Design a protein with these regions (language model features):
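A broadly tuned preference for mixed-charge, low-complexity surface segments
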Residues: 98-109, 150-162, 236-263
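A Trp-anchored, charged/polar loop motif used as the substrate-binding/catalytic surface
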Residues: 30-34, 171-183
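Glycine-rich phosphate-binding loop signature in dinucleotide/nucleotide-binding domains
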Residues: 90-93, 181-188
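Residue-level preference for the first positions of well-ordered beta-strands
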Residues: 47-48, 188-194
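Active-site-proximal alpha-helix that buttresses catalytic centers in soluble enzyme cores
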Residues: 2-123, 166, 214-230, 240
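Phosphate-handling substructures
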Residues: 57-58, 65, 69-73, 111-177
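Acidic, low-complexity terminal tails and accessory targeting/binding regions
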Residues: 2-44, 130-142, 186-189, 201-278
C-alpha cells in the first residue's frame, strides 16, 4: 500500500525524526517491520500502537477466524516478550490503560503485553475494534457475506463501496481515528489498541486512499501501526503514522472532505463532541 501516495498523504523523511535504533534482538516471531518502525519513532508524542493480536490458532480456508480461537503458547510468549521489549527500549511509558476488541485473543494480547512491561492496567473493551463490526451497520446483511466471500474480498468490496450493510469507506476510517483521538495518552506515553487484521488492513487502506489491497498488504499477527496526532482540534489535526518502516501524514480534513463529497451527513460520524461540522 505504501506505493500509493497522493496529494493528501505525505511521507516524512527520517532525518526529521529522532532515531531509536535498539541494540537488543527483537522477540522471536515478531514481524521484522516492527523494529524498522520503532527506529523512526519521534519523542514525547501521545503515541498509540494499533496492533493485530499475537499468534493464534489457525483459521479456516477463507481466512475467517472464529471469535473463540485463542492465542497459541508461542503467541502468549510473543505478546509478553514484545511488551517487555517495548518497555525496555523506548523513551515511552506503557503505564496507561489499553483499549481492545472484546474478543479473547485481543484482550489476552493486551494483558500479556502489559504483564511483560511489568504493568497491570485496565483494558477497555471497544466494539469499534471488533471484526468486522467497526465497518458494519447492518450485521444481518454484511456478516453472512463476510463468512461467504472471505476476509480479503470483503475488505476490497468495502473499500470499493460495493458491499451492502457497511459504512461508507471514509466513515470506517474516521470512526477509528476519532476513537484513538479521544483516547490519547499523555505525552511520552504509549497506549495499546489491540484489534484484528481486517480492521487494521481496512484502516490503513483508507489512510492510503486505495480501493484494493492484496495479501502482501495484510497485517501479520503482532504487526501494528504507530500513530499520533497534532496537538490541535480533531478536524484541524493530521494523523501521523508509521507502517512497515515508513512514516506518513494524513490530514484528517481530507478524510472529512471525502466523506462529505460522497453525500453523507456528518451526524453519522462518531466525531469528538467538540467538533462542530456544518
Amino acid at each position: 500500500m505504501s506505493k500509493y501516495l497522493n496529494n493528501t498523504l505525505s511521507k516524512i523523511s527520517a532525518d526529521k525524526l529522532t532515531s531509536h535504533t535498539p541494540s537488543a534482538p527483537a522477540p522471536s516471531h515478531l514481524p521484522d517491520s516492527m523494529i524498522s518502525s520503532v527506529s523512526l519513532l519521534p519523542e514525547n508524542k501521545r503515541l498509540i500502537l494499533f496492533t493485530r493480536h499475537s499468534l493464534r490458532e489457525r483459521s479456516d480456508g477463507n481466512g475467517f477466524a472464529s471469535y473463540q480461537l485463542p492465542l497459541t503458547p508461542k503467541g502468549r510468549i510473543l505478546a509478553k516478550s514484545w511488551g517487555r521489549w517495548l518497555s525496555g527500549h523506548l523513551p515511552y511509558s506503557l503505564d496507561v490503560d489499553s483499549i481492545s476488541s472484546p474478543i479473547g485473543r485481543c484482550i489476552d494480547t493486551a494483558q500479556l503485553m502489559q504483564e511483560g512491561a511489568g504493568l497491570r492496567r485496565d483494558i477497555t473493551h471497544q466494539s469499534l475494534l471488533v471484526e468486522p463490526g467497526s465497518l458494519v451497520t447492518e450485521p444481518e446483511i454484511a456478516n453472512p457475506v463476510f463468512k461467504e466471500i472471505g476476509v480479503l474480498n470483503f475488505i476490497n468490496r468495502f473499500l470499493q463501496g460495493n458491499l451492502e450493510g457497511t459504512k461508507n469507506t471514509y466513515q470506517g476510517g474516521l470512526d477509528i481515528l476519532s476513537l484513538f483521538y479521544q483516547n490519547q495518552p499523555q505525552h511520552g506515553h504509549l497506549m495499546l489498541a489491540v484489534s484484528h487484521d481486517t480492521l487494521l488492513s481496512a484502516f490503513l487502506a483508507v489512510m492510503f486512499d486505495v480501493v484494493e489491497i492484496d495479501w502482501n498488504d495484510w497485517p501479520k499477527m503482532m504487526e501494528g501501526v504507530f500513530l499520533w496526532f497534532d496537538d490541535k482540534p480533531f478536524d484541524q489535526a493530521s494523523a501521523h503514522f508509521i507502517w512497515r518502516g515508513q512514516v506518513y501524514t494524513r490530514p484528517i480534513s481530507s478524510l472529512l472532505d471525502g466523506y462529505r463529497a460522497a453525500g453523507y451527513h456528518p451526524s453519522k460520524l462518531l466525531l469528538p463532541p467538540e467538533v462542530q461540522w456544518n
